[in-house]
Amino acid sequence: MPQGWSSRAPVDGDVDELIALVSTAKKAVDGSGSIEEELVTSEAVGEASWTRRQVVVMDPQGAIRVWARVHDRAAGRSNVDLTTDPALGAEVEDRLAPSVLAWAESIALRVSRGRGLGGTRLDMSVHEDDERLRGLLRDNGFTLARTWLQMRRPVEPGDVDLPTTHAREGVVVRQVNRREDGTPFAADLQAVYRMIEESFADHFNSYRESFPEFLLRLREAPGHRWDHWWIADIEVEGHWVPGGAVAAAVLPEDASGVPGTYIDYIGVHRLARGRGVAKSLLHAVIADTARRGRNRVALEVDDDSPTGADGIYASMGWVTRYRTESWHRDVRVEGTDDPVPLARLDE
């Protein structure tokens, strides 16, 4: 690093500065400094920090100018997040980037060794307008792997009737069953997990994830709510069985002061495809969003989805607001033949 610069793990007293840094960096890319402050706090010092290793880089005056995180996303996959102060300038940033990315690689490999693995895939998400980060990754051995559509659908009060007006025979959508205190029953949680795991088996960049890993990761989100998880039961030879599921969360208020709903996952089992399960689940989420007085439902979809999901979303009123990109770099631990799990589509 440049002379006088230093690094350390973030502490509670850094949260406000990190929120400001993330907001400034986002504004420099898309013109909006609106961020989820609770998410920044959780990743830095809260529950989401449990599955992340991170470092802040400070200039000679002690100001945080870079925040890097390595998320142990799954066996064989390490998500890397890099937030830099746009005011750094290209010369300083070009000097810092190799050091920070080398740190991320070393941490990811250390975590992999802890899992008994011989390596991992570094995965970084880049906004389509972030040419600065794209250039840094390209110069440090990363390659563009995929493009994702970030879509949003406005919600109107009349949408509460969608599940009734668009009901599909042989498909019933319900929220996961919960006890009086709101805690969900294990059978339904396992059904949601199974539907999502099995439905994403033929999707890009989908890694095997254990049931506890799945639950912990989704519960980390500040907007997590058990009453935002749905199951679509389908009738098969006179019996009702799960055919699909949705895991959603609360979106923070937008510029108009109204919250929304975000669909983290929607999965339809391969044997249930073609029966209107996906649309039935989407109608349930839209109707629930309308009943709660919210104004939008957002989601992410693969630009090259094997199921043509983007076409379904577009036909139901979703529009693409912007795109993000996945940049990858595969790294291995030297001197070991231990396995490196692949994405299921690559197995």
Which sequence ranges carry the predicted segments?
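Short amphipathic alpha-helix that is part of the acyltransferase structural core
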Residues: 1-40, 164-209, 338-347
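Conserved acetyl-CoA-binding loop-helix of GNAT-fold acetyltransferases
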Residues: 92-110, 265-268, 274-291, 296, ...
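Active-site/acyl-donor-binding loops of N-acyltransferases
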Residues: 125-160, 228, 283-347
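Extended hydrophobic-aromatic, low-complexity segments
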Residues: 86, 203-204, 226, 230, ...
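Active-site proximal loops enriched in glycine and acidic residues that flank catalytic Cys/His/Asp
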Residues: 234, 246-252, 265-270, 277, ...
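Flexible, substrate/cofactor-facing loop regions flanked by secondary structure
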Residues: 161-261
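Conserved donor-binding loop and adjoining core beta-sheet/short helix segment
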Residues: 22-116, 126, 242-259
